[in-house]
């Protein structure tokens, strides 16, 4: 389910914290993600059973026009929630969806029609 910006529960920050802890930490914090959802610049999703949470954002001006970006997710993966997000994105005029993450996501998302298009590299100073 997609939350309206005014209805985002406080528990969302802690529900998304595991995603942050396992992430590259390049895309902000759970607090920032939820702030953006409350401002309407990102979207918060939760599976019907409450075990899977995700944050998305819509990019404009890409090679695809509008594109849905899966920013973060946490909990027990729910393919139905991903499909719900994709359907919503199509309604918004998005022509594609993308996400990033750890290597295991490649196999999982490839079964849903996603393909690997880039590898991210990081060097700390």
Whereabouts are the PLM-identified features?
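Short amphipathic alpha-helix that is part of the acyltransferase structural core
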Residues: 1-28
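Short glycine/proline-enriched coil/turn segments at helix->beta-strand junctions
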Residues: 47-51, 93-94, 115-117
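Terminal substrate-recognition subdomain of acyl/acetyltransferases
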Residues: 4-7, 59-60, 100-125
């Amino acid at each position: 389910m997609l939350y309206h910006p005014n209805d985002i529960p406080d528990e969302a920050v802690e529900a998304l914290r595991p995603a942050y802890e396992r992430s590259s930490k390049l895309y902000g914090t759970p607090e920032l993600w939820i702030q953006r959802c409350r401002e309407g610049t990102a979207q918060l999703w939760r599976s019907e059973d409450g075990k899977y949470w995700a944050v998305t954002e819509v990019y404009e001006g890409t090679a695809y026009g509008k594109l849905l970006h899966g920013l973060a997710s946490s909990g027990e993966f729910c393919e139905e929630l991903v499909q719900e997000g994709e359907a919503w994105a199509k309604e918004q005029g998005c022509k594609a969806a993308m996400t990033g993450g750890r290597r295991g996501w490649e196999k999982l998302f490839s079964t849903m029609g996603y393909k690997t298009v880039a590898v991210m590299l990081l060097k700390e100073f």
